[in-house]
Amino acid sequence: MMKNQLAGLMKQAQAMQDNMKKMQEQLALIEVEGQSGAGLVKIVMSCKNDVKRVSIDPSLLADDKDMLEDLVAAAFNDAVRKAEATSQEKMAGATAGMPMPPGFKMPF
């Protein structure tokens, strides 16, 4: 009986690994947009944290350099948070049915 349970668990783990690989490939195609300054600075990145585009409203280019740098950093951080949330949500389906320890966080 124990041998069958182990075989089932191994099969489940292999399926989860396959699902996670497919999901990671899909995450590279999903884009999220981070914003700051009420949309004056926007950063588009993939859920694999590859920055695709940076948009800065022309009105900010004549302004304070420090403020612009802060807005870019804030937009980047917003995009990273959105990418992480999307990744966690999508990967939750890949691990469905597998017993995971409480608070376990996947490395992606």
Swiss-Prot record:
Keywords: Cytoplasm, DNA-binding. Residues 99-108 have a biased composition (Pro residues). Signal peptide: none annotated. The keyword Cytoplasm applies. Residues 86-108 are annotated as: Disordered. One of its GO terms (molecular function) is DNA binding. It is found in: Cytoplasm, Nucleoid. SUPFAM superfamilies: YbaB-like. The keyword DNA-binding applies. One of its GO terms (cellular component) is bacterial nucleoid. Binds to DNA and alters its conformation. May be involved in regulation of gene expression, nucleoid organization and DNA protection. PANTHER family: NUCLEOID-ASSOCIATED PROTEIN YBAB. Homodimer. Belongs to the YbaB/EbfC family. This is Nucleoid-associated protein HEAR1046. It comes from Herminiimonas arsenicoxydans. The lineage of its organism: Bacteria, Pseudomonadati, Pseudomonadota, Betaproteobacteria, Burkholderiales.
